[in-house]
Amino acid sequence: APPLEAVPPIAYGGTERIVSELVHELDRRGHHVTTFASGDSRIPGRHVVTVPEALRPAGLADDPSAAFEETVRMVLERADEFDLIHSHIERWNLELARRTGVPVVSTFHGRLDVPWAAHAFAEAPRGLVAVSEDQARVHPEASWTVIHHGLTFDLPPMVGHPGDAFCFIGRITPEKGILDAVEVARTAPRLRFSRA
C-alpha cells in the first residue's frame, strides 16, 4: 500500500480503502496475505511496516518518493516469499514489476496524464490494472485490464425511492468533473444546491 495513509484510512484515502477491502476479503477466504503498509494500519494477516505512521496525516507527504522507494526495496527483499504481488504504489508499480521474477498485478488508482507517465508505459510489464476505461485510454500503448473500484455491502442502504436531490461525497479535484456537473445541474428544474 502507499505509505501516505493508514490501511484502512482514517479519513481520506481511496487507494488505502481498496487495499483494506482486498486484504480483509482475501484473509476471510483463507489466503495468506502480507501487507506492506504504514505502522498505524490495522489489517489482518502479516503486516510489514514501511513507515512508522502514515505520511499525510503526519505532515510528511511533501515528497514521499523516498518512502515509496523504500517500500519497493522492502518488497523486493522478500519477493521470493510470495506467489503473487499486488501493488498499489502508482509509478513505483512499474519499477517493482520490472525488478522481480514474481508475477505482479499493478493497479493504478490515480491520474495517468501526468509528466512521469509520458513514456512510462511504452514497454510496460504485463499485469496492468486501470480503475476505469477513461484512465486506460490515456495510455493505449499499454495492455490494460479494467477493474472498477467496488463497494462493500456494509455501507448505509441506498434510498429506495428517487427524490429531487443529489449528494456528492468525496474529494473535489479537477479530474472528477464536479464543475461540469454543477453547470449541467444548473439547467435542471427544481434542483436545490447545498454544501457541507
Residue ranges of each PLM-predicted region?
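Catalytic cores of nucleotide-sugar-dependent glycosyltransferases that transfer UDP/GDP/TDP-activated
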Residues: 1-196
